[in-house]
Amino acid sequence: MSFNISQENEFQTMYIKYFNKTYSIIEGSYNYYLFVFYIQIALIFIVLFYYLLNVYIDIKTCQFSTNTQKIHHAIYLPCVLGHVMCLIQKILLIKDSPAGDDMTNPVFYYISLFRAIFCFPGFYCLSAFVAERWFATYFLNDYEKNQRTWLVGLILWIIYSIAFISALDFHTAPSTVIHVTIFILLSCLAYLSNYLNFLLNRSYYYKSNRSDGGGYSLAQRFQISDNIRFSFFFNRLALSIAFFQISGPMCLLIDNLNISRSWKNLNTVVFDTILLLYAIVTPFVIYHHNPKYRTELQKIANSIRNIRVRTNKNQIMPMDSLDESFNSLRIQDTFGKTIVFNVTEQTSTYFEKLDRAWS
């Protein structure tokens, strides 16, 4: 694929992301940016190490069983590969390679294209998670036992197709407004869809708690509770990454403005930094709410510090009373509220039922 100089003006603002090194040297800001580049390279290696650590722990704890986990890993890997493309961009730029900032160089184009293809699915991750939960609600009868792996393939095929088409069009379109609009619109729809899914499952939950069970089986009630818990998790995840979901596309939108090359260079560096922090914060939030992951990570940390790990999962520290022992377990209901035990009342109720059963 060949390029000529006349194409530069057409594609100049559409690359992921173009940094004009020559202009930066002329204005005297390159040394400052070079320092930032080295920090970004260090962050990329942290992202790569963090990814390998997460995959290792997931393999040890068998975290590939649910559709949600499969979708997470299928989107997580391309994002990491996108940062590998970013690493190559930085190295070529620092080494004064023609492929580092020469838009007429085919290598520069393909690195930018592959980086976009790998990174764009990250902007659609919330939509993918919510879509899977709607399928879980629709197939309420047996979703716990039959998760229908083909659903993962369908969701990922749609996500990857949109990302691929967006990346190709991004490098030829005269404006990035439509791409940014799609990114933000899908994120907003994901928030709304998650809330509607929560309301629907909450109504199912209240029906299932009737004295007659509402006609729901035990498996259905479990799935309803699981959907509600996921809605709360989604809210925490969405709030944690909302800044990145909005600021990243906004940086792409700024490229359409008629601003100086100096500001565009700054915008490029800010965009790269946002994506790097996004790649660290998102998996951290996801894994922070995973008990199996936290337990295994603690074991690894303890082994590094040569501290013996206690394997008794249900160990209860000595308490002044039995009530404190029960309450120290911090058992929560479906909606995340802590259940407080009144041991005396619970014991009396238990023996009354037992006495009636023996009578």
From Swiss-Prot:
Q: Which domain of life is it from?
A: Eukaryota
As for membrane topology, the entry says: Multi-pass membrane protein
Subcellular location, record wording: Membrane
Q: Where is the chain membrane-spanning? A: 33-53, 74-94, 111-131, 150-170, 180-200, 237-257, 266-286
Q: Which GO terms describe its biological process?
A: sensory perception of chemical stimulus
GO CC term, one of those recorded: membrane
Q: Can the keyword Nucleotide-binding be found in this entry's annotation?
A: no
Keyword entries, A-Z: Membrane, Transmembrane, Transmembrane helix
State where it is primarily located: membrane
* One Pfam family in the UniProt entry: Sre
Is the keyword Transmembrane assigned to this protein? yes
Q: Which PANTHER family match?
A: SERPENTINE RECEPTOR CLASS EPSILON-13 (PTHR47518:SF3), SERPENTINE RECEPTOR CLASS EPSILON-13-RELATED (PTHR47518)
Family under the similarity heading: Belongs to the nematode receptor-like protein sre family.
This chain belongs to the protein called: Serpentine receptor class epsilon-13
